[in-house]
Design a protein with these regions (language model features):
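Beta-propeller domains
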Residues: 15-47
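Short beta-strand elements that form the blades of beta-propeller/WD-repeat-like
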Residues: 5-25, 57-58, 62-75, 106-121, ...
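Well-ordered mid-protein domain cores that form the structural environment of catalytic cofactors
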Residues: 37, 44, 49-50, 57-108
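Repeated scaffold domains used in trafficking and secretory/extracellular systems
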Residues: 1-7, 50-60, 95-112, 146-156, ...
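Long, internal scaffold/assembly segments composed of regular secondary structure
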Residues: 152-167, 171-251
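A short beta-strand motif characteristic of beta-propeller blades
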Residues: 1, 41-47, 91-98, 136-144, ...
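Asp-box/WD-like beta-propeller blade repeats and closely related beta-sheet repeat scaffolds
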Residues: 79-81, 89-116, 120-126, 135-153
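Beta-propeller blade signature
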Residues: 29-37, 79-90, 127-134, 175-188, ...
Length: 251
């Protein structure tokens, strides 16, 4: 029995990857199968990966598939990370350790020379950016009194910036949920934290981000309108919120 994972690779078809067998107590053999767009197998690659490391997330861009592996370090109550980079149009495949500062990575995305890793840990939204040529790691952390939930990560390629969204859910129903937006350059060198102004009687419950060709941003999501601050009187709706030149619009 094998636990298969896959990644769609655009014009390069798709890859399927799985742990094939255990070489010794420290090392496992993994297989990567590449298929073209007609689902004909074109390559079979084997690579040795530390035993007990498991794939957490993968992302395809510009002929490369990046696969993030996590191995728990129970002694230090932390995680050890590895990045496998598979090149679809070449035999080049490599595995490198990553010095990430977060333990609960749930999503990765790659653009240009950067790999973005987003975590949703206890009460904290965090993200690491890896500069792939040097493997240097930087971090952004969004901490708040409220319990937070990661909403999106979008890249504005026109203006070379990164947008990370997080919902702030209240601990008690009397408090209104808000939304936080991290607006950063690609390398996390400079960033600003923006928040929705709290709207009377509205709880934000979802958010997605769309970036236009002109660089304008539209935030779209759902909300609950609470007329009497009772769960039985919640009415769901949809909002659209423009974000231009570092300023939020109004719901």
């Amino acid at each position: 029995y094998h636990d298969y994972s896959y990644e769609i690779c655009g014009r390069n078809g798709a890859i399927v990857f799985y742990k094939s067998n255990l070489l010794n107590k420290d090392t496992a053999n993994w297989v990567i199968l590449q298929y073209d767009t007609n689902l004909t197998q074109t390559r079979n690659t084997e690579i040795h990966i530390p035993n007990l490391a498991e794939p957490i997330s993968s992302y395809y861009t510009d002929n490369f598939v990046h696969i993030l592996f996590q191995k728990d370090d129970n002694r230090n109550k932390s995680s050890v990370w590895f990045l496998l980079t598979y090149q679809c149009d070449s035999v080049n495949t490599k595995l490198l350790p990553l010095a990430l500062t977060l333990n609960e990575i749930s999503y990765i995305k790659a653009y240009d020379d950067y790999l973005y890793c987003v975590a949703n840990e206890k009460k904290t939204i965090g993200a690491n950016v890896v500069h792939l040529p040097t493997m240097e790691v930087k971090g952004i952390y969004l901490e708040d009194y409220y319990i937070e939930q990661y909403a999106f990560l979008e890249i504005d390629t026109l203006n070379e910036r990164l947008l990370i969204g997080a919902l702030h859910f209240p601990k008690v129903h009397e408090a209104l949920s808000t939304f936080a937006l991290i607006d950063s350059d690609l390398g996390f060198n400079e960033y600003a934290l923006k928040q929705y102004p709290e709207s009377d009687g509205i709880w934000l419950t979802g958010a997605r981000c769309a970036v236009s060709d002109s660089g304008d941003v539209l935030l779209v999501g759902t909300y609950n309108h609470n007329t009497e601050k009772r769960l039985s009187n919640l009415h769901t709706g949809v909002y659209a919120l423009p974000y231009r030149n570092g300023k939020m619009g109004e719901i």
